[in-house]
């Protein structure tokens, strides 16, 4: 996908990104004043928060995985498909020993919103199909 992302990733000038299928727009910025630092994702009127360390942890995990991995995005109250980025982002086996999402009730959908930012930052390759998209490390 051609990188048409606007913004610099600050609260005043957030990145404006699109979901992997390209059907929805959202904004995201990094909040380094939070402890630990967070990614703040605005989707319409909904604000999601994820641990910013995922920007390093996801590419590291994908390099170890060694191939394409399905995104598997799912809401918090729905189970994530095994072997997907979404399942990894909730797993007690990941580097944070659980959820990367920080806002209770809104911790899911990690695989919908974080990979487009990682793609923009040049850390991953991301598919942009209507559904069943995958990602791999660069």
Task: Please tell me what each predicted stretch does.
Residues 35-38, 98-99, 136:
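Charged, low-complexity intrinsically disordered segments and flexible loops
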Residues 111, 131, 136-137:
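Nucleic acid-binding interface residues in structured DNA/RNA-binding domains
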Residues 119-133:
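A short, conserved structural fragment
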Residues 2-80:
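Long, low-complexity, charged/polar intrinsically disordered regions in eukaryotic proteins
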Residues 42, 75, 86, 110-111:
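Long Lys/Arg-rich low-complexity intrinsically disordered regions in nucleic-acid-associated proteins
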Residues 59, 112-116:
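Short, hydrophobic-biased segments on the C-terminal half of alpha helices
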Residues 96-99, 116-120:
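Compact DNA/chromatin-associated regulatory and scaffold domains in nuclear/nucleoid proteins
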Residues 82-109:
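Short helix-coil junctions and helix-kink-helix linkers
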């Amino acid at each position: 996908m051609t990188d048409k992302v606007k913004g610099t990733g600050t609260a005043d000038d957030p990145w404006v990104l699109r979901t992997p299928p390209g059907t929805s727009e959202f904004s995201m910025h990094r909040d380094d004043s939070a402890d630990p630092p967070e990614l703040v994702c605005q989707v319409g009127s909904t604000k999601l928060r994820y641990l910013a360390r995922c920007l390093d942890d996801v590419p590291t995990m994908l390099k170890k995985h060694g191939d394409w991995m399905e995104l598997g995005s799912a809401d918090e109250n729905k189970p994530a498909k095994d072997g997907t980025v979404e399942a990894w982002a909730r797993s007690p086996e990941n580097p944070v020993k659980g959820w990367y999402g920080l806002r209770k009730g809104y911790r899911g959908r990690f695989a919908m919103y974080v990979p487009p930012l990682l793609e923009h930052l040049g850390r991953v390759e991301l598919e942009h199909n209507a559904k069943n998209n995958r990602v791999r490390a660069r």
